[in-house]
Amino acid sequence: MDVLYPRCAGLDVHKATVVACIRLALANGQAATEVRTFGTTTAGLLALAAWLAENGCTHVAMEATGVYWKPVWHILADDEVTLVLANAAHVKNVPGRKTDVSDALWLAELLAHGLVRPSFVPEPETQVLRALLRTRKQLGREKASHVQRLQKTLEDANIKLDAVVTNLLGVSGRAMLEGLVEGESDPGKLAKLAHPRLTATPERVQEALRGRVTRHHRFLLRLHLDQIDALDAAVARIDAEVNGNLASFHAAIGLLTSIPGVSKLAAQVIVAEIGIDMGRFPTAGHLLSWAGLCPRNDESAGKRRSQRLRKGASWLKTTLVQCAWAGSRKKAGYLQAQFHRLRGRRGPKKAICAVAASILTATYHMLKNGTSYQDLGPDHFKRRSKQAQAQRLLRRLADLGYAVEVTSVAAASA
């Protein structure tokens, strides 16, 4: 097998150590290897970089192991060396022969022959935006957990507040919760704290607030409300920081928000996950495959065993699915037509994944060509398959016992 990179290295990265193996091709066709272990402190990683430069390494491969690879990547990226991040599932060694040294040697061997498929690593400024928005999403999940605990505490006290308000943290819900925390137990007085435009009647509100609230319930309610307020404040700080890092992304975000269902926040997340340089993905299909929005390849003996979606980029996929649900509810649009066309025969889950794939495909071409979104229209599928639709209707009429002769409107009027 041809050697593409005669001077390369493989790194087996751990929390405290990095096992590095240099592979140098010799004139006789053999290869010389040298293995060293370095610490993951800054001094240790700088020593690793100096050792690689001293041996003239041009390419370095490492596995994507949690977050441990990132400090190594950032320090080695400052040197004139090509870094390759490998998916651990793609470079597995022979079972039963796994050691740190053998892993590093195996990575170096695969890299030398060009057998390591590089994973997508965005530019540094995109990585900053990605870290901020992923943290924002995690804080949102934590807030949702505290809201659920809030509801559980209210149920324990037999307060059915969520039955009369749509949002516990809305104007009416928050006012009545604060009243409960402050020690008010009279349902009539608590009901008067609700906003006048609350749809539930005062009698229903009073009945929902008639419970058994004890001291520990008030303590837990106050605790969860304080946590929710703290998380809201943290999200606001992240939003301010994100806005300060959007200088080079404003044009791309403006384009993406023209897609039905894609909000400004969703556009920011999409840009943070895939970047704005679509040259990293040869085609839209490559981007869909990386995101996990296309069927997997699982064939044996000429039979397709599974067509389930791969896990892919979960941070991106969840956002795209949310956008797809929003887009499928936009009237008189292509995305809604696509969803309803597929839902009847494939089910809503597969249909919404197809809509998400359409949004990502449009995103790819918009960012690559700098064009705005052009909706194909709700009648796109009817226009595209007019003849097939006519034949299908004729077969249906024939099944019902009718013989029909078809003449086009233009020919009949001529």
Label every model-predicted segment.
Residues 1-414:
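A detector of single, family-specific signature residues
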